[in-house]
Amino acid sequence: MDKQKIADSIRAVYNYKPGVIFRDITTLIGDAEVFKEVINILRSRYENQSIDFIAAIEARGFIFGSALAYALGIGFVPIRKKGKLPYNTISEKYTLEYGTDELHIHTDAFRDKKNAKVVLIDDLIATGGTAEASVKLIKSIGAQCVEAAFVINLKGLEGEKKLAPYTQVFSIVEYEGK
């Protein structure tokens, strides 16, 4: 299957927010063949890299991240919004269009594995703020984020540039616009 079929499976919802084309992944994950292909692309990329954990960003990142962790036979680490993790956490604030928010990770998320190799997964990268905060969280508890992978990259919003100082970026489908 080519990447165009994956791109074609993503529904574009115009003006979901005024002036925004929302990339709806529910049509992708609802198509078993396409969903499997996305996970296979990611599995093939990471299966020979000695990755220790997959970390994923709430909520849509969990869909792809947990499936990938299962396919690789490694642990899955959720990165969640404030108040959603029940044990000791650390947080990282990030800027939104109209304010700030914060993400949390358990302080023991990587099971005391020194310098664990982690791949960060999310469904989409736009401006990169959420991903940047997530990479900082991963690093702050002693792991290394070897790459951040996204199903969709909205190139026009330049999120890759925000992540460049911290990690490499991989995406399956790219859209030039915003």
Swiss-Prot record:
Catalytic activity reported: AMP + diphosphate = 5-phospho-alpha-D-ribose 1-diphosphate + adenine
Its Enzyme Commission number(s) read 2.4.2.7
Which keywords fit this entry according to its UniProt record? Cytoplasm, Glycosyltransferase, Purine salvage, Transferase
Report the CDD domains cross-referenced here. Answer: PRTases_typeI
Q: Quick check: keyword Glycosyltransferase in the entry?
A: yes
Give the HAMAP family listed for this entry.
Answer: Aden_phosphoribosyltr (MF_00004)
Disulfide-linked positions: none
Q: What is this protein called?
A: Adenine phosphoribosyltransferase
Q: Entry's PANTHER family?
A: ADENINE PHOSPHORIBOSYLTRANSFERASE, PHOSPHORIBOSYLTRANSFERASE DOMAIN-CONTAINING PROTEIN
Q: Which GO terms label this protein's molecular function in UniProt?
A: adenine phosphoribosyltransferase activity
What family is this?
Belongs to the purine/pyrimidine phosphoribosyltransferase family.
Which segments cross the bilayer?
none
Purpose:
Catalyzes a salvage reaction resulting in the formation of AMP, that is energically less costly than de novo synthesis.
Q: Which organism is it from?
A: Helicobacter hepaticus (strain ATCC 51449 / 3B1)
